[in-house]
């Protein structure tokens, strides 16, 4: 949902409220996080100011507004919406029941016809439409517009009006490095590339059985994670030993555990608990007092080491929080190739507009790929979005699987002339695919031999090496999920996105949040095997509904002055449902190359 800062300012000015630019930016972020439009957010804000009798509005007041007022109000609204959603699902079940009756009737009619002599007029013929005329040419010779005709799966589909009349086509929304004067075109399949999927220890390559996990198995995975990260923190900070959580001590103690909440609500600074590890604390829990900590950033599921006073064994007064330690960078070797710089194009779904099921954005993307011929194209799902109105209402005449196959065939055949390597990443919102995390790659058994060399179907999440440059890829809206749960206190100017990205790398996981969002179905045994970071990626790509950004971090080997910094030379991108182009030099792998701004990035 797009939120305009200008409209938000105008709504507040109606009530005589003047806010600083930083406050407006924070309000825009809250609008996206809590699904509010400009008018609704202004109304909630006025109600809060009236009830608390506040005349001026600061960032501190805004934090109180979020925790004490907005989250409670929105939770009630969502509870009411869940009831309405149940009614809509009931209507969808009726549609399915009618469809089943029609299919049974057709089967009976087919059985009856098998005992009679078929008439000449009963022979089936291929249905043709103006968009898909019947020709003698093979399917592969047709254009993408003919391959992906919406009339084949949605006769009522109409062209998207807003998309076709948009005025910002091709607009550059942000850039990094020497984006100006760079030739944004690759060599397609002309230059040799080394493409490898990394795992921890092996990547996920196929489906697995899920919905069979037991609670002790989940507990074991979480315990292993605490022990592994605790061991790294102990070695890095030279900690002698961890103390048991429930044992009183008059001297400062150092405790290892996982952050949790004392209730089912949202985490706040008064509801933080520390759940100890199995070896030292037998999994016991203790409330944490954060009043002595000047700076902290916490979320449920975070593995931390805390130092503090535990005189009673019933509450820890934390005085120090140890920062997590990221994994080392991957060091390129001879197998990673020795090519010149290469161009990567990234796009994320959905590839339809909200008001139409036609794939006009996808067809435009194919045109751009054929024009610019990038060396690698990374395409994130969803390809057929489960949240699309026509999908939710079951208005498609073809099965979800058939529509996806038609979409995938259009991408592969439509870009064949470019020679670009295709990396296809699934999404939990792909309506036809397995809704479990980590998510297996798509299956496509009918790939031609010439396409098998350039098409790579990978899992969600995935760690990919392109000529030794490591890309961390995830289509899950991790920024949105963790942004809604994280609490922080900081005397500096660090922003929420930088902190979240820091957590992802220091927790060494593509989804460190526990418990996860309600719509996330995580299989924890496979999560432990396939959703951990094998190395710190050079580039971390996380599409999100939140605003796009590019963030760069520092370490001792890199001296880049950048306003937004977060960690260890890694480069993080949120494409925010837009396309971006990137050019990567040979020297970028292993966390180097950012120093001279030799990486060029452009988001459109």
UniProtKB/Swiss-Prot annotation:
This is DNA polymerase alpha subunit B. It is found in: Nucleus. The N-terminal 240 amino acids are sufficient to mediate complex formation. Belongs to the DNA polymerase alpha subunit B family. One of its GO terms (biological process) is DNA replication initiation. GO terms for cellular component: alpha DNA polymerase:primase complex. Phosphorylated in a cell cycle-dependent manner, in G2/M phase. Residues 143-160 have a biased composition (Low complexity). Gene3D superfamilies: 3.60.21.60, DNA polymerase alpha-primase, subunit B, N-terminal domain (1.10.8.530). Accessory subunit of the DNA polymerase alpha complex (also known as the alpha DNA polymerase-primase complex) which plays an essential role in the initiation of DNA synthesis. During the S phase of the cell cycle, the DNA polymerase alpha complex (composed of a catalytic subunit POLA1, an accessory subunit POLA2 and two primase subunits, the catalytic subunit PRIM1 and the regulatory subunit PRIM2) is recruited to DNA at the replicative forks via direct interactions with MCM10 and WDHD1. GO terms for molecular function: DNA binding. Keywords: DNA replication, Nucleus, Phosphoprotein. InterPro entries: DNA_pol_a/d/e_bsu, DNA_pol_alpha_B_N_sf, DNA_pol_alpha_bsu, DPOA2_OB, Pol_alpha_B_N. The keyword Phosphoprotein applies. Residues 113-141 have a biased composition (Polar residues). Its main location: nucleus. The modification Phosphothreonine is found at residues 129, 132. The modification Phosphoserine is found at residues 143, 149, 154, 156. The keyword Amino-acid biosynthesis does not apply. It comes from the Eukaryota. Component of the alpha DNA polymerase complex (also known as the alpha DNA polymerase-primase complex) consisting of four subunits: the catalytic subunit POLA1, the regulatory subunit POLA2, and the primase complex subunits PRIM1 and PRIM2 respectively. Within the complex, POLA1 directly interacts with PRIM2.
